[in-house]
């Protein structure tokens, strides 16, 4: 582990020097990559510096053990420093685990009503409100790009952009099928209905990440529509971008958030590129799964990941076990997703640590 830590500390120094060079500003994309890498390495380097300071304090305290007047104080310092050094070792081990390169990216969030008809559409909007509050609590911005709303206050589909630092890391756990169990407002017999909403979370494609051939994209413009088909402005500002129309590869994106056709066109192309990048990633993942003859469940879009039980005021995340899988529904729906996300991230780190330990054991045996 020490060798890898030294390499990363040296890399951090090089990144800092590069950022301090005025020439770095001449290439905005390179500068963005440098600042991102700096943010990624800073937590690890901060812990390394704390460890170095503690090791120095520990050596000083050990030298004082021979002084009868200072022995008790020195022993206390040694005990505290040793405990913290052990804790730092565990924290550094976690930071050395593989990280998701998409964690820092913005997010394209898609909510689609599934089984349950109008009730599923209403839950789409409930989830949108939950995600909006969650994003705000984390200093992120959620901007709705497209909403196919109904007269009942629901929506069959909502597409939103979430921007800000570590947006994808905050939302990546949400992809999958969300199930809601509750008594609809229109249910006169008091029966509990079950509905579903599918959530897709795509890391927003960055400039140059996907080569989008604009000759394969058809751009349509039309007037923005509100709930029930009511027009919300009198200009053709809404944009529909269709990639490879009429083919099995077709991807359609609609953006009608802004009043500017130019801005809607730019955002539609960003969403289109993000979906294309996700399609390419999914194809690579599927090939890797076939190559190793194993199916990794946590990435499947069709999985039921969470149940929202209104009568029992309980949210159950089916990827977790024990006490960590159940959470108070009223808190979660108010945007309090933090404990759920923390439990999922902690569970993932534990799996990675086990895998790393197993790999080290195999290497040692070899």
Curated annotation (Swiss-Prot):
It holds the Pfam family PCRF. Peptide chain release factor 1 directs the termination of translation in response to the peptide chain termination codons UAG and UAA. Gene3D superfamilies: 3.30.160.20, 3.30.70.1660, 6.10.140.1950. The keyword Cytoplasm applies. This is Peptide chain release factor 1. The lineage of its organism: Bacteria, Thermotogati, Deinococcota, Deinococci, Deinococcales. The modification N5-methylglutamine is found at residue 230. Belongs to the prokaryotic/mitochondrial release factor family. GO terms for molecular function: translation release factor activity, codon specific. It comes from the Bacteria. Keywords: Cytoplasm, Methylation, Protein biosynthesis. The gene is prfA. It is found in: Cytoplasm. Methylated by PrmC. Methylation increases the termination efficiency of RF1. Residues 283-335 are annotated as: Disordered. Residues 283-293, 315-328 have a biased composition (Basic and acidic residues). InterPro entries: PCRF, Pep_chain_release_fac_I, Pep_chain_release_fac_I_sf, Prokaryotic/Mito_RF, RF-1. One of its GO terms (cellular component) is cytoplasm. Its main location: cytoplasm. Coiled coil: none annotated. Transmembrane segments: none annotated. NCBIfam families: PRK00591.1.
């Amino acid at each position: 582990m020490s060798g890898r830590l030294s390499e990363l500390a040296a890399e951090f120094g090089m990144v800092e020097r590069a950022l301090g060079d005025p020439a770095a500003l001449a290439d905005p994309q390179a500068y963005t990559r440098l600042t991102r890498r700096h943010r990624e390495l800073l937590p690890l380097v901060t812990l390394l510096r704390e460890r170095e300071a503690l090791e120095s304090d520990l050596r000083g305290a050990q030298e004082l053990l021979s002084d009868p007047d200072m022995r008790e104080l020195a022993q206390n310092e040694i005990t505290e420093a040793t405990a913290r050094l052990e804790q730092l070792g565990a924290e550094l081990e976690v930071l050395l685990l593989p990280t998701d390169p998409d964690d820092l990216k913005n997010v394209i969030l898609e909510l689609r009503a599934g089984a349950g008809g109008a009730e599923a559409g209403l839950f789409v909007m409930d989830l949108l409100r939950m995600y909006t509050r969650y994003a705000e609590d984390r200093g992120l911005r959620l901007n709705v790009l497209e909403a196919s709303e109904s007269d009942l206050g629901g929506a069959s589909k909502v597409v939103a952009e979430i921007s800000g630092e570590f947006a994808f890391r905050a939302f990546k756990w949400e992809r999958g099928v969300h199930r809601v169990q509750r008594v609809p407002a229109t249910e006169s017999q008091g029966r509990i209905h079950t509905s579903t909403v599918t959530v897709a979370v795509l890391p927003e494609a960055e400039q140059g990440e996907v080569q989008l051939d604009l000759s394969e994209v058809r751009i349509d413009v039309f007037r923005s529509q509100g709930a029930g088909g009511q027009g919300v402005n009198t200009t053709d500002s809404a944009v529909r971008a269709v990639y490879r129309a009429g083919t099995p590869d077709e991807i359609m994106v609609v953006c009608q958030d802004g009043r500017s056709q130019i801005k809607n066109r730019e955002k539609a192309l960003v969403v289109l590129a993000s979906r294309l990048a996700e399609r390419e990633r999914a194809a690579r993942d599927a090939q890797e799964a076939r190559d190793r003859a194993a199916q990794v469940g946590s990435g499947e879009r069709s999985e039921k990941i969470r149940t929202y039980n209104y009568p029992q005021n309980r949210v159950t995340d089916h990827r977790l076990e024990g006490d960590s899988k159940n959470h108070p529904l009223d808190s979660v729906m108010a945007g309090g997703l933090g404990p759920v996300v923390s439990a999922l991230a902690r569970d993932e780190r534990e799996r990675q640590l086990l895998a790393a330990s197993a790999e080290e054991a195999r290497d040692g045996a070899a």
